[in-house]
A protein has these predicted regions:
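Structured adenosyl-cofactor binding patch, chiefly the S-adenosyl-L-methionine
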Residues: 201-242
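Residue-level signal for inorganic ion chemistry
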Residues: 33, 94, 130, 207, ...
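N-terminal positively charged helical leader segments and presequences
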Residues: 1-68
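Short, hinge-like loop/turn segments at secondary-structure boundaries
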Residues: 120-123, 182, 233-234
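Mobile, glycine- and charge-enriched loop segments
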Residues: 36, 61, 69, 73-78, ...
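Generic structural signal for residues in well-ordered beta-strands
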Residues: 36, 60, 142-146, 214
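RNA substrate-binding interface of SAM-dependent RNA methyltransferases
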Residues: 67-165
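Active-site/ligand-binding-proximal alpha/beta "capping" segment
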Residues: 162-204, 212-216
Length: 242
């Protein structure tokens, strides 16, 4: 069943925004009576069907509100700005896993900086990727993407979580399941993943001073995009609904 974002529902029906309507009509060639999943982008989903087509406008009849499928834990990933299009992959997979937010961070060993308008353009691109990923996986709430932030601002945000996890290649012994044993009720979790060059010792010191816990992801060093997805998957397995 194809998923679409809708405008505000009124009296059990809603219109598809122009871009969604074009996709439904021109690409998928849907017709009145075809079943769809309607999403408002704020967490609500409905089982629906195409109720009417008028030129390029599409009305969806909302038949039944579907159960909430958001994760029971709010997960934010702070990703040291990587090179190329790795953030695209991370945004897509975090959406599928149920992550709440992605916050790109300018860390000491980042090559990419993405400042000013470049940073805003990247945020908009990542939000679009997250929205499309949410449609594909049937998730009612797209991943929230922050504009690239400086280290000091990120550090302040990190300190606000119930639990802050730092996958680090130099961490020894402590695994995520060990942290879960001590903190099973954490519901607002942050993960900090370093860029290709890794996290500096000074950054580790500042994060641990703010309450962060260093953890190992095993004896092999993972790429930054792999570490982000693996960490999120483990958190969702332990604290979430995977």
């Amino acid at each position: 069943m194809h998923s679409f974002y809708i405008d505000s529902p009124i009296d059990g029906a809603a219109m598809l925004p122009p871009e969604e309507a074009r996709h439904a009509l021109k690409v998928l060639r849907l017709r009145p009576g075809d079943a769809v999943c309607a999403m408002d982008g704020a967490g609500r989903r409905w089982r629906g069907k195409i109720g009417g087509i008028d030129g390029g406008s599409v009305r969806v009849n909302l038949l039944e509100q579907l159960p909430d499928n958001e994760a029971p834990v709010r997960l934010t990933v702070y990703e040291g700005l990587p090179k190329a299009d790795k953030l695209d992959f991370i945004a897509q997979k975090l959406t599928e896993l149920g992550g709440a937010a992605l916050a790109p961070v300018r860390m000491a060993r980042c090559v990419a900086k993405l400042e000013g308008r470049d940073g805003e353009k990247r945020r908009e691109r990542l939000e679009k990727i997250a929205r499309e990923a949410a449609k594909q996986c049937g998730r009612g709430m797209p991943l929230r993407v922050a504009a690239p932030m400086d280290w000091r601002k990120a550090l302040e945000a990190m300190a606000a979580h119930d639990l802050l996890l730092i996958p680090w290649e130099a961490a020894e012994g402590t695994r995520l399941k060990d942290i879960f044993t001590l903190n099973p009720d954490a519901r607002d979790i942050g993960i900090v993943v370093g860029p290709e060059g890794g996290i500096t010792a000074d950054e580790i010191d500042e994060m641990t001073a703010a309450g962060g816990r260093c953890v190992t992801l095993g004896p092999r060093i993972l790429r930054t995009e792999t570490a982000a997805v693996v960490s999120a998957a483990l958190v969702m397995q332990l604290w979430g609904d995977v």
